[in-house]
Each structure stands twice: as structure tokens, then as C-alpha cells.
Amino acid sequence: MRIAVDAMGGDHAPAEIVKGALRSIEQFDIEVILVGQPERIKEFLPQGEVPARVRIKEATEVVEMDEHPAQAVRRKKDSSIVVATRLVKEGEADALVSAGSTGAQMAASLLGLGRIKGIDRPAIVTVLPTLEGGKLLLDVGANPDAKPEHLLQYAMMGSIYAESILGIQNPKVGLLNIGTEETKGNELTQATYPLLQKAPLNFIGNVEGRAIPYGQAADVVVCEGFVGNVVLKTTEGLAGALFQLIKEKITATPLRKLGALAIKPGLKEIAKMMDYAEYGGAPLLGVNGISIISHGSSNEKAIFNAIRVAKECVESGFIEEIKKELPRFTAAQE
């Protein structure tokens, strides 16, 4: 198995990207193709030598975060994200991972890999930590102006991903809304609800945002990209602020510091559970290839886990499963 990694994408590229890639070949039986500028990549390789099961593919350009994604992808044919995507398209790699511009990765994936036939818009799916383990939320940013049929497709892809990757049998699918009643919501959610009811899914109805952290209502929560991105970033910010507040309060006095020692192991476990780096990357579902989007501030651990996610996606064959199941969903709507 070969994973193409955009070595030039991200706030800490190429250092943390290369470190994460090297860690992945120690843990997994894979080959990593580091795509980018060879002289910069080699600075972070042991003794500047390319180890076994690592290959460097030269790309002379980089799409910067402040560039217009689609325009940059079309203009910079030799950028690291375009070259990495091309490797997947041409069969030289089985998946790609990037912590660079999300918009550029989406554009490169759509232009280079194309959409799965029958999927109108791709969706970014992420795993959210909950009291019941990891649950899926999609879309978290690919398509901020979705239509009801798009949300139906997201629900189908999310359900297959939950079964294939998370091992959840017959996953419960919920529609993110402002209330649990069927009549709640805006035009989009009200039009989507009957489509999900009719679909061959384990649809449990509307889910409120406050139910997501508990993880009991649904295994897959579906929404348009604008709302999903707000939920994701609010969750990240709230988790960070909460841990900062806890740290300040439990170390405020000498007596509290003593008590903090007793609960430190538990706090470490919670911090690990809430750490985005543990979850690695978010797959772009709906494109005809495996494209894993990593956080722009990804460190070594996050890149390692993004490569792990890419490996699991390849092994699961979930893209072929989507292609196989799509006609059944289409027929149910006729």
C-alpha cells in the first residue's frame, strides 16, 4: 500500500509532516511517498538519507493558504497537492494526505479524481469525541449551500463509513436540527427529513446540537457544511477553553494542587480523547479516490493518525461499497 503525503502543506511543514510519515512506516506495512521539494524534505530525514519504504516525489510549487483554491490548483500544475492527487489518479498511490489548504485539496480532488457517479457534492466527514466514543459529523465544510438530495447522499456515505471504518453495525443516522420534532427547522431540514425517512437507512429523526457530545442519539449526524463547520470549530474551542479553565482552577491554591495530583491521570485520559490529533484526518467523501484532509496545524501525531486513517480507508474498500450501495438509495427515492 502506498500513501502520498503532501510534505509542503500545513503550518509545520515539512518538519512535522516528515516526522509523522517516518513514524507511520515504523508502525504500518506501507510505503509513503513524500511530495514536495526534495532538499527541504531531506533536512528532516535521518542523516538526510531516504529510508526504505519512503520515496520522494518532486513538486516545485506550493499552494499557499491565502491563495484562491481553484485558481491556484489550475495555475500551479506542479504544486505538491496537485502532484499528490495525480499519483492517486494514475494508480501510483492508493490514497493522499494533506494538511495544506482545504479548499485547494478539495479542488485538486474534484478536478483530479472526479466524483463518484451519482454523488452530486462531496462532504468532509469528521469523528467527534463523545461519551459513547467517536461519532460522525458531516458535512463539516465542503459544501456550505447544500440541497436536500445532497444531505441524503451524505447520510448514505456516512452510514457506510461508520460501518466500514468505525465498525458500527446498522448505524443510527440523525439530521442536525433546532428541535427533535419532525416539523422543526428551516426549508432545508424540513425537505430533507422525508427523504431520509424513505431511504434504506436507520434514520432516527432530528438531533439537537446539545445531544451530540453525549453520543447516544445518533452514530452519524448529517448537516450542511456551514453548520457542520461551526459545530466542529465551536467544539474544538470549547474543549480547549474548558481544559484551560480546569487547569487554572485546580492549581489556584496549594491545597487544590494536592488534589490535582490525584485526578491528573483522569484528566490526561480526557485530554487525549478530546485531542484532534488522535483522530488524524477527515476523509473527503464522494470523490473517486481516498483524500484525507488534515488540520492545518497538524503535528507529527496528527499526520501519523491521518496516514492511519488513509490506510484504514484503503483496506476497508468503502469507496467500492458506496458505488455498490448507491443504486439502492436511488431506487428508494423513485
Curated annotation (Swiss-Prot):
One of its GO terms (molecular function) is phosphate:acyl-[acyl carrier protein] acyltransferase activity. Pathway: Lipid metabolism; phospholipid metabolism. The keyword Lipid metabolism applies. It catalyses: a fatty acyl-[ACP] + phosphate = an acyl phosphate + holo-[ACP]. Gene3D superfamilies: Isopropylmalate Dehydrogenase. Its EC number is 2.3.1.274. InterPro entries: FA_synthesis, Phospholipid_synth_PlsX-like. One of its GO terms (biological process) is fatty acid biosynthetic process. Belongs to the PlsX family. This is Phosphate acyltransferase. It comes from Desulfitobacterium hafniense (strain DSM 10664 / DCB-2). The lineage of its organism: Bacteria, Bacillati, Bacillota, Clostridia, Eubacteriales.
